[in-house]
Amino acid sequence: MTINHFALNAVDRSAELQGKGASRRLRKQNLVPAIIYGGGEQPTAISIKINELVKSLEFEAFFSHILTLNVDGEEHQVVIKDLQRHPAKGFPMHADFQRVVKGQKINMNVPVHFSGREEAPGTKAGGVLSTLVTDIEIVCIPSQLPEYLEIDVSGMEIGDLFRLSDITLPEGVVIAELELEDGHDRTIVNMQPPTVEEVDEAAEVDAADVPATEQGTDESKDGE
């Protein structure tokens, strides 16, 4: 397995009883229950070795790549659509995979990378770059699925903002929100002015501003 290709082995569990009890038994065997659906076929219940899945989850690209699931020797091209983790320990408890059909568009959430923040004039002027998204839902055919969307913020001044429609998209890729009739072109990053801390002027009175009589009184006390 490389970052550009993810392959997992799985076992078909469709013939077995499903449910919470069955899922618990699989987890006790260090297996993660999962399901494959879509592509005009019936859903298939499967299990994956937890160590294999955890290793793949270490890569951000796993969530935005076409994956290969080898189910009892039969390969399935899929994308991961949902992952349930243990609320406290974080290990995977269940996964949903969607079959990929060649030439058929899919909806996927892909990560967003912001580049050039240190070079931005706004940053150099003390501004704060505020990023409002970590991923964006896109629509495209499987062969055009990008690993991530990169947004160059190196030209942002204080007060500038970046909207969904400002993103330079790869060929064949559209943003799902902008395709909706009621979709709105929301802000995804902006450059805010420097944070100014309010100073308690009463506590910052300069000694030079204190009347001479008061200074003399303090000095006389120090000399006693």
Curated annotation (Swiss-Prot):
Part of the 50S ribosomal subunit; part of the 5S rRNA/L5/L18/L25 subcomplex. Contacts the 5S rRNA. Binds to the 5S rRNA independently of L5 and L18. This is Large ribosomal subunit protein bL25. Signal peptide: none annotated. One of its GO terms (molecular function) is structural constituent of ribosome. The keyword rRNA-binding applies. Keywords: Ribonucleoprotein, Ribosomal protein, RNA-binding, rRNA-binding. SUPFAM superfamilies: Ribosomal protein L25-like. Residues 197-207 have a biased composition (Acidic residues). It holds the Pfam family Ribosomal_TL5_C. It comes from the Bacteria. Gene3D superfamilies: Ribosomal protein L25, beta domain (2.170.120.20), Ribosomal Protein L25, Chain P (2.40.240.10). One of its GO terms (biological process) is translation. Residues 195-224 are annotated as: Disordered. Transmembrane segments: none annotated. One of its GO terms (cellular component) is cytosolic large ribosomal subunit. The keyword rRNA-binding applies. Belongs to the bacterial ribosomal protein bL25 family. CTC subfamily. This is one of the proteins that binds to the 5S RNA in the ribosome where it forms part of the central protuberance.
